[in-house]
Design a protein with these regions (language model features):
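Short glycine-rich anion-binding loops that position phosphate/pyrophosphate groups of nucleotides
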Residues: 62-65, 113
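Loop/helix-junction capping segments adjacent to catalytic residues or to phosphate/diphosphate-binding pockets
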Residues: 13, 40-41, 65, 119, ...
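Short acidic, glycine/serine/threonine-rich loops at helix termini
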Residues: 2-6, 43-45, 69-71, 98, ...
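Short, ordered loop/turn segments at secondary-structure junctions
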Residues: 4-5, 35-38, 62-63, 80, ...
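Short Gly/Thr/Asp-enriched flexible loops that form oxyanion-binding sites at enzyme active sites
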Residues: 66-78
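Flexible glycine/proline-rich
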Residues: 76-222
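Phosphate-binding glycine-rich loops and their immediate beta-loop-alpha structural context
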Residues: 1-59
Length: 222
């Protein structure tokens, strides 16, 4: 936990606090299950227990291909894994499934472990599901077309979200400027940004001045 001394091979748990804050903004009652050990049985039993008293389960980490990544296995044993991995960046190793609880199928979203990937996949993938489960009809945020103040290339067939800030050019025209680093572990990049630019699967190149789809954080955080 933040504030405690870390030991070798440990990192601070930022995701739990970020997710709880984002969920509470959506009016959710959050039941925090804490940090789980890298133990297959413990993870399975914690997910089973959580499914009995909650309408949606949300995890972060433990969903990649490491020896200690047991979340996918637990989902399959307790219910069904509907998909694992999407052609997106950041957040490729996201998974969605359900856990059987008597006569209910409780949805579970297994988010990646990197802080930026967690926040981006929550805002663009998990958030609409939370709103849908809450009875909301308007589950998709508004995007705005704004000229880019950057150039970038990307892989065709993959959807990407870039962290950007609003800037003014010499003519006082509003543009979006890309955060200089792409690492999924740089949480400060989210704090320093005004929103996300979404590049669809068919886009392979953005040149400075091109119109891009801009999602202000105000659309998904308020």
């Amino acid at each position: 936990d933040p504030g405690e001394k870390s030991h070798s091979a440990q990192i601070f748990d930022i995701n739990r606090y970020s997710l709880m804050s984002l969920l509470k903004k959506l009016g959710c009652k959050v039941n925090d299950m804490g940090i789980l050990p890298d133990d297959k049985d413990a993870i399975r039993e914690s997910i089973r227990s959580a499914s009995r008293n909650n309408d949606l389960l949300l995890t972060s980490g433990g969903v990649s291909m490491g020896e200690e990544d047991h979340v996918r296995t637990a989902i399959n044993e307790l219910g069904k894994l509907h998909f694992w991995k999407l052609l997106i960046k950041p957040g490729r190793p996201i998974a969605l499934g359900h856990v059987n609880d008597e006569d209910r199928e409780v949805p579970i979203i297994a988010l990646p472990g990197n802080p930026v990937a967690v926040m981006v996949t929550f805002l663009r993938i998990a958030r609409p599901l939370v709103l849908l489960l809450s009875g909301s009809v308007d589950i998709h945020p508004n995007y705005f077309s704004i000229p880019s103040a950057f150039s970038v290339t990307k892989k065709k067939g993959r959807r990407e979200w870039l962290r950007v800030s609003l800037v003014r050019d010499k003519g006082n025209n509003l543009k979006v400027k890309k955060f200089p680093f792409d690492g999924s572990g740089i949480l400060s990049s989210m704090v320093s940004s005004d929103g996300l630019v979404e590049l669809s699967e068919d886009i392979v190149k953005v040149t400075e001045g091109d119109l891009v789809d801009f999602l202000p954080f105000s659309e998904v955080l308020n």
